[in-house]
């Protein structure tokens, strides 16, 4: 949020705490009175911010979508974000799988590569199967009908 000029806020506008109805999305300028950002660095050199909202007042023009109807929109975007995060994780997994395989082919013990050891081969096969399964589920998620909430939830649950 450190570089953002606006933020989207989900707020309960009616109903009780557990109700799916009653959540509304608002857009507010970062410099608005009632919004404070506390920026901090992250381990991977990205920037992050804690957004503190206190007594923020917004006009009706700040409403995004329909009043009290944002729950399903938020759920859909969380699911899409989960697919994106899993896609990144799969890329990391591929790099680790390839690096491990290369290491096992090049590392020698008792005059031969450790990849000749049957136990190592079993583990490499297990790792490859887990990777291929994750990749297949990711492809299924990407090509599924994300506009269908039931199908989207099932697919994202399988992907996690």
Language model: regions and residue ranges:
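A short core secondary-structure module
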Residues: 1-36
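Residue-level preference for beta-strand/loop junctions
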Residues: 3-5, 45, 118, 155
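Short, glycine- and charge-enriched coil/turn segments that flank and shape catalytic ligand pockets
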Residues: 16-21, 146-152
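Glycine-rich beta->alpha junctions and the first turn(s) of the following alpha-helix
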Residues: 35-132
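Surface-exposed helix-capping loop/turn segments at secondary-structure junctions
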Residues: 103-111, 139, 143-149
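Active-site pocket-lining segment
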Residues: 125-147
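Charged, glycine-rich active-site and insertion segments that engage polyanionic ligands
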Residues: 150-160
């Amino acid at each position: 949020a450190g570089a953002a000029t606006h933020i989207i806020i989900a707020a309960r506008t009616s109903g009780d705490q557990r109700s799916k109805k009653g959540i509304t999305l608002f857009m507010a300028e970062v410099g608005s009175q009632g919004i404070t950002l506390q920026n901090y660095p992250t381990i991977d050199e990205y920037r992050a911010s804690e957004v503190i909202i206190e007594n923020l007042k917004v006009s009706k023009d700040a409403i995004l979508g329909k009043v009290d109807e944002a729950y399903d929109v938020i759920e859909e975007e969380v699911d899409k974000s989960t697919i994106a995060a899993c896609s990144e994780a799969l890329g990391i997994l591929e790099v680790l799988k390839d690096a491990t395989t290369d290491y096992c082919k090049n590392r020698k013990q008792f005059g031969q590569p450790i990849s000749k050891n049957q136990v190592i081969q079993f583990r490499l096969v297990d790792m490859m199967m887990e990777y291929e399964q994750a990749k297949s589920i990711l492809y299924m998620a990407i090509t599924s009908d994300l506009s269908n909430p039931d199908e989207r939830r099932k697919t994202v649950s399988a992907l996690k």
